[in-house]
Amino acid sequence: MTPVRMQHSLAGQTYAVPFIQPDLRREEAVQQMADALQYLQKVSGDIFSRISQQVEQSRSQVQAIGEKVSLAQAKIEKIKGSKKAIKVFSSAKYPAPGRLQEYGSIFTGAQDPGLQRRPRHRIQSKHRPLDERALQEKLKDFPVCVSTKPEPEDDAEEGLGGLPSNISSVSSLLLFNTTENLYKKYVFLDPLAGAVTKTHVMLGAETEEKLFDAPLSISKREQLEQQVPENYFYVPDLGQVPEIHVPSYLPDLPGIANDLMYSADLGPGIAPSAPGTIPELPTFHTEVAEPLKVDLQDGVLTPPPPPPPPPPAPEVLASAPPLPPSTAAPVGQGARQDDSSSSASPSVQGAPREVVDPSGGWATLLESIRQAGGIGKAKLRSMKERKLEKQQQKEQEQVRATSQGGHLMSDLFNKLVMRRKGISGKGPGAGEGPGGAFVRVSDSIPPLPPPQQPQAEEDEDDWES
């Protein structure tokens, strides 16, 4: 016969020691006692082994902490008598894992040894006959829990409740000069208006609806001053630092370093959010990754492309002799000499690379202004000289127009000259602005030489080519 095991009383309980049933045969009782004692021995052995393992684990943790403490103490003893400045780096966070290990029971994973199959024993003795008298005697000895307390009656909702024990007469029970029992039904009796019945619910509603007296600020029309909210934010403050007048060098002081060198690389202060001076950042010279590609010919900037060709001339002018190639050469040479002279001039010191190496017409104009000395070094001229120069230029233009009128190339040359003068500010279409660096720059640019008269020896094939 197998022993009956007790039910688990706690959630997660692993072990359950069986108890021995009464009224068993002798052999059966002895077998169950032996099995229960053997089971109890296994359970106690497992419990003590787990406790010893947990104690060993805790002892190893305490030993590791002790080693850390001894190491820190040895470091402190080593630097205690030193007079050299030591910089200590401390982490802002405690060196511990971000998530702590949860506590686990020492009985996790334990198995109940009672679940194992045990050998079955065969008992030869027979059961004793049932005795009714003995059974009745056992029932008398066992305590039986019987509830003798009567169930509470529902409280009356209309009356005052149960009758008190100190009532001695009927007159003290009934309402004065009436036959109303207030403990059964609570009423307000008025001889003129009649009896008005009120229950406990109505009385509770009256008490709940009653308001308290108004505060003094409302009844006396007083005004409360608005309270200033307190600021609970942390505001760092260095405070008042006491001034100590001591000599600059204090030799042979115990526990004081003698090689302190205060510099700006000590790191942030104790109040990093306090306002402080911003250190000056170093300047970095940035360079362009890919320089601008400028079309150069023999180290000289190429002139801008020529204007579009004019419309075809009438047939009368088409039969004119062509322009010899020697006339175009001086023009190109003069432009190249002008560009080479401007490029060969010394560059301004400290100017950026894009300004020193211009890549367009505006850059060339700025470079010419810079070489001329700017507005501060420009020489101003009087209005009389400028008017005389303009009159001379107009006379020269009229002479050229009369001497070279009717020729295709001369007309084209005159148009180019007028265009250059209009751009430089000398033409009739330009505004009469004040003199300055622009006038000086425009004067420094030489005009194109006048075209030579065409020779009769050239053929028309050269003009067409």
Swiss-Prot record:
Statement: the UniProt record of this protein carries the keyword tRNA processing: no
Assembly and binders: Component of the WASH core complex also described as WASH regulatory complex (SHRC) composed of WASH (WASHC1, WASH2P or WASH3P), WASHC2 (WASHC2A or WASHC2C), WASHC3, WASHC4 and WASHC5. The WASH core complex associates via WASHC2 with the F-actin-capping protein dimer (formed by CAPZA1, CAPZA2 or CAPZA3 and CAPZB) in a transient or substoichiometric manner which was initially described as WASH complex. Interacts (via WHD1 region) with WASHC2C; the interaction is direct. Interacts with VPS35; mediates the association with the retromer CSC complex. Interacts with FKBP15.
Location in the cell: Early endosome membrane; Recycling endosome membrane; Late endosome; Cytoplasmic vesicle, Autophagosome
Pfam families, per the entry: WASH_WAHD
One GO cellular component term noted in the UniProt record for this chain: cytosol
Biased composition (Pro residues): 302-314
Cross-link (Glycyl lysine isopeptide (Lys-Gly) (interchain with G-Cter in ubiquitin)): K220
Region listing for WHD1, in residue ranges: 1-167
Domain of life: Eukaryota
Gene: WASHC1
Post-translational modification: Ubiquitinated at Lys-220 via 'Lys-63'-linked ubiquitin chains by the TRIM27:MAGEL2 E3 ubiquitin ligase complex, leading to promote endosomal F-actin assembly.
Span list, region Disordered: 297-359, 376-407, 423-465
Keywords recorded for this protein, A-Z: Actin-binding, Cytoplasm, Cytoplasmic vesicle, Cytoskeleton, Endosome, Isopeptide bond, Membrane, Protein transport, Transport, Ubl conjugation
Other remarks in the entry: WASH genes duplicated to multiple chromosomal ends during primate evolution, with highest copy number reached in humans, whose WASH repertoires probably vary extensively among individuals. It is therefore difficult to determine which gene is functional or not. The telomeric region of chromosome 9p is paralogous to the pericentromeric regions of chromosome 9 as well as to 2q. Paralogous regions contain 7 transcriptional units. Duplicated WASH genes are also present in the Xq/Yq pseudoautosomal region, as well as on chromosome 1 and 15. The chromosome 16 copy seems to be a pseudogene.
Entry keyword Protein biosynthesis: no
Domain-related comment: The VCA (verprolin, cofilin, acidic) domain promotes actin polymerization by the Arp2/3 complex in vitro.
Family note: Belongs to the WASH1 family.
GO biological process, one term: extracellular matrix disassembly
GO terms, molecular function: actin binding; alpha-tubulin binding; gamma-tubulin binding; phosphatidylinositol 3-kinase inhibitor activity; ubiquitin protein ligase binding
Descriptive protein name: WASH complex subunit 1
Segments of skewed composition (Basic and acidic residues): 382-398
